[in-house]
Amino acid sequence: MIVGVPKEIKVLESRVALTPGGATVLCGQGHHVSVETLAGDGSGFSDQQYIDAGATILSSAAEVWAQADMILKVKEPQPNEVAMARKGQTIFTYFHLAADRELTVSLLEAGSHCFAYETLELNGTLPLLTPMSEVAGRMSVQEGAKALQAPEGGRGVLLGGLPGVAPAQVTVLGGGVVGTQAAYMAAGLGANVTILDLSLDRMRYLEDVMPANVTTVYSSPQAIKALLPTTDLLVGAVLIPGAKAPRLVSREDLKIMQNGAVIVDVAVDQGGCIETCTPTTHAEPTFVIEGVVHYCVANMPGAVPRTSTFGLTNATLPYVCKLARMGAKEALGDDQLRSAANIIDGKLCYQAVADAFGLDNHSASDLAQAL
């Protein structure tokens, strides 16, 4: 199979979908890897490293898309990339379709086979979402701490405080991978941290593994509202796999928050769990509503591309190899790869996305028989 790796073109997105080491593995299995020139530059990988790994360097994205049987990406295809996608071509990337009807419809019209990293399940976990969730969770506190500084429009609060000066209050909505990593980072900096979640089992686990400055609270609208007036940094970290994130904080709720408090909504790529959050970029990451600073960058890990690219390839490569070996039709018979299938041959096959837009959903097994 010809596996194509185009350069990412989302604003200030410097990750690449495959390391040279990953290219070596694919080439060793008999596949042909085509990489757009400079695709790995932002992550510190030269064209020569890909050539040494056995890959071919192509001069444009158009060539990569035209030649490849399977496209590997990091972020969802941008409009000009969708225009290059073709019927029967496989695309393996983060799609987050439930947050973007226009992209969903465009891909349905393209007729490509769309396998989403973020919905691939293994024993109840999301192994291809986990590494980027880990990065985003840690970054949410780094970026939130910076946004709390007065020159950034924040309250001028140091997360860890000082001897004789109280630390900041960090409230984390969701105790999954993102929330856990955010809590670890904030606690490590000395903040007082509260994690809200709906799973008692998860909260028992967090109580066991977290330091003493982290507490858990059963999530409810009342519990969230009770914490907002004293919250310095609010991290949105809720996830419903493949579906739009639930809205937990309304615009009206912001009025009870402190002036200069900060919200980092990591769920923004799934629609966001804060009503006032809309996607921003690394170039202009923040905006202010009701006196509250909002950080809503949808590709946070893109700011640390080298770390993120290694983490991504480490997780995705076994599934990339399997998908390249099987092809889309056979892959739909594999439990894990079938869970990643969102669109097959121009038809939607992921219920949460269908529900988000009121579209028809189809059985992946039935679609496989028609290929």
Model regions and ranges:
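A short helix->loop->beta-strand "cap" motif at the edges of active sites that frequently abuts
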Residues: H31, R86-T90, A110-S112, Q258-A261, ...
